[in-house]
């Protein structure tokens, strides 16, 4: 750090070191990068990381302002980074339960499903937690488990969890196009590509 601290300061020496670390430019950039990686992309744009790091420094490390900078940035709303992140297994399971309106009173089967998808809860060995990098969640085995989870959920094959299919496919949606539109609106909350629509119409 390029600083010399005289001996004999006791606990104050330790606090001084922590303060030097907290105010170091590398700390501002590291924290800003990790937050941008969490909310934007595995490799967030350097320009955004720089702006967030500048806010971190100017606000004396106010994380709220750093997050505000990221979430209100043009990059956050850019089509290039829209839905750029792969959900972790826990995020996938929670959002699927919410999107389908499933009723559940059994945590164990869901926790087991999350573990099979690669994220055994509270069992991450490094103290830093599970990776924010999408590649950590993507493999042929974990993708298969994600598909199995989706099929089991919508097929009501997860013990203690029920999905009301009629909520997603009402009598008014017998027309295939309307059914696909309703499912996309309920589960995706925005449009999908023409190729995806064509593939759905073949199911």
Stretches found by the model and what they are:
Residues 1-39:
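Nucleic-acid-contacting surfaces of polymerase cores and analogous helical-repeat interfaces
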Residues 24, 28, 32-59, 68-203:
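Flexible, low-complexity segments enriched for small/polar residues
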């Amino acid at each position: 750090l390029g600083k010399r601290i005289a001996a004999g300061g006791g606990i104050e020496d330790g606090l001084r070191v922590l303060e030097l670390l907290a105010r170091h430019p590398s700390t501002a950039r590291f924290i800003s990068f990790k937050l941008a990686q969490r909310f934007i992309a595995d490799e967030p744009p350097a320009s955004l990381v720089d702006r967030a790091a500048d806010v971190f420094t100017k606000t004396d490390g106010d994380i709220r302002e750093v997050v505000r900078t990221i979430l209100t940035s043009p990059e956050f709303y850019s089509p290039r980074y829209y839905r750029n992140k792969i959900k972790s297994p826990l995020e996938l399971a929670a959002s699927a339960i919410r999107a389908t309106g499933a009723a559940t009173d059994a945590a164990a089967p869901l926790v087991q499903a999350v573990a099979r998808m690669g994220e055994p809860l509270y069992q991450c060995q490094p103290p830093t937690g599970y990776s924010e990098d999408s590649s950590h969640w993507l493999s042929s085995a974990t993708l298969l488990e994600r598909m199995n989870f989706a099929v089991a959920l919508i097929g009501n094959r997860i013990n203690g969890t029920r999905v009301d299919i009629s909520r997603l496919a009402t009598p008014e949606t017998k027309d295939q196009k309307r059914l696909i539109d309703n499912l996309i609106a309920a589960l995706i909350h925005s449009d999908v590509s023409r190729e995806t629509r064509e593939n759905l119409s073949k199911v």
